[in-house]
Amino acid sequence: MNRPERLQPGVKLRDADKVSRIPVKVVPSERDTMLRKPDWLRVKLPASNQRITEIKQALRKNGLHSVCEEASCPNLSECFNHGTATFMILGAICTRRCPFCDVAHGRPLKPDAEEPKKLAQTIKDMKLKYVVITSVDRDDLRDGGAQHFADCIREIRLLNPEIKIETLVPDFRGRIDKALDILAIEPPDVFNHNLETAPMHYRKARPGANYQWSLDLLKKFKERHPDIPTKSGLMMGLGESNEEIAQVLHDLRAHDVEMLTLGQYLQPSKFHLPVERYVSPAEFDELKDLAESIGFTHAACGPLVRSSYHADLQAQGKEVK
């Protein structure tokens, strides 16, 4: 059996090159076997792309990344047109290789020590009032990137004292207590960590992740910061049943998570995990009703919902679909 080639620093692996390195084989989808996308998932492009161009230029100017672009989010046009973006720190190369995700895999470069200041200035220039900061997984770092998150939060608040900051963090490779000790110095206004799918599908969809680690991360943060909302997101269409998702919702509530996002998985390319079903808006409404009935303070559930989609409105408890 041939060993995978040694990863070179800074080289992005995508699509077939990326998924070939995971333990579960993903067979490329043939066009005639792919499910037809229903009408409710058709995204209308805005008439003007000027605001989109401006935001992309602001990101490029300071060498920053948005998860909107790197993960091929279907809401990019809408969010950029409204002047919002989710910033992705610690580079654009992930040490994990989840076959549902379009972010590149590889051997990341050393974190940019100037990124926190560049990020803060960009946010000020864009006159943003609410930002989401996320990152790739950095299993190569002893703290999983926690210190870089804290540095970014500190610098953002120095230049933008009125801003609200939501962090969408990785699992820090199970180094939970160390990461939370660091984040306690500069906690966010909303703490988000996505479970992504039901535990039965972790080996297939999230190699390297651990369901209980993720739940423990959310619960331990809440124990330390009882007044800061905790949040998590899930995708549907990876082979899970509605009953499995319902159990995950109960698990989240048992770990004191208050906010939920639930959306449809969309296959980034034929080399990624296939969409096994398209969940109807009515089913999302049913799961939203369940979430609210078991105590979530806010649940954004719909085909195009993503964890940072209209995050400012989610944090205010407004309806998002």
Curated annotation (Swiss-Prot):
PROSITE patterns: RADICAL_SAM. It is an enzyme of class 2 (transferase). One of its GO terms (molecular function) is 4 iron, 4 sulfur cluster binding. The keyword Iron applies. The gene is lipA. Pfam families: LIAS_N, Radical_SAM. [4Fe-4S] cluster 2 binds at C94, C98, C101. It comes from the Bacteria. It catalyses: [[Fe-S] cluster scaffold protein carrying a second [4Fe-4S](2+) cluster] + N(6)-octanoyl-L-lysyl-[protein] + 2 oxidized [2Fe-2S]-[ferredoxin] + 2 S-adenosyl-L-methionine + 4 H(+) = [[Fe-S] cluster scaffold protein] + N(6)-[(R)-dihydrolipoyl]-L-lysyl-[protein] + 4 Fe(3+) + 2 hydrogen sulfide + 2 5'-deoxyadenosine + 2 L-methionine + 2 reduced [2Fe-2S]-[ferredoxin]. Pathway: Protein modification; protein lipoylation via endogenous pathway; protein N(6)-(lipoyl)lysine from octanoyl-[acyl-carrier-protein]: step 2/2. Keywords: 4Fe-4S, Cytoplasm, Iron, Iron-sulfur, Metal-binding, S-adenosyl-L-methionine, Transferase. Its EC number is 2.8.1.8. Its cofactor is [4Fe-4S] cluster. It is found in: Cytoplasm. Belongs to the radical SAM superfamily. Lipoyl synthase family. It comes from Shewanella piezotolerans (strain WP3 / JCM 13877). Binds 2 [4Fe-4S] clusters per subunit. One cluster is coordinated with 3 cysteines and an exchangeable S-adenosyl-L-methionine. Residues 80-297 form the Radical SAM core domain. InterPro entries: Aldolase_TIM (IPR013785), Elp3/MiaA/NifB-like_rSAM (IPR006638), LIAS_N (IPR031691), Lipoyl_synth (IPR003698), rSAM (IPR007197). The keyword Iron applies. [4Fe-4S] cluster 1 binds at C68, C73, C79, S308. This is Lipoyl synthase. One of its GO terms (cellular component) is cytoplasm.
